[in-house]
Amino acid sequence: AGKGIVALAAYAELLKLSGQESESAKYQKLAQGFVNDWLHGAADGDHFRRQYDLPGTWSQKYNLVWQKVLDLHGLFPDSVFEKEAVEYGTRRQSYGIPLDDRHNYTKADWSTWSAAFYKQAYLMALRKHV
């Protein structure tokens, strides 16, 4: 869901850059509405669920990195990134953070994308394990 929401916001930005302000506003409002739905549907205490209807699940939200890469300020609030970064710290194993609650393996590319959630101090501490 997050990837699609970011894609809508990116499309809104493209419309804005091409001078189509009213169309841009429509898609930005749609994306923000989906963010609000996601925040409520995926909330699971100290983290966000892997799937809306599965409480107790978790996953790396690596596709939210594109909000930061594309500089889409104000879409998903910073609290989402902060909350997820704390959760990932509790899930970290010697080889990294598993992709989700179903498996113990990870992928370096997706974990790298998730690293965008962390503050600089955490990244420096993590560096000694790489």
Where on the chain are the PLM-derived regions?
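Extended ligand-binding clefts on enzyme/binding-domain cores
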Residues: 2, 25, 32-130
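Inter-helical turn/loop segments and adjacent helix faces that build the functional surface
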Residues: 11-28, 73
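Short alpha-helical scaffold segments that flank and stabilize functional sites
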Residues: 7-10, 34
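Mobile, glycine-rich extracellular loop/lid and propeptide segments
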Residues: 1, 8, 15
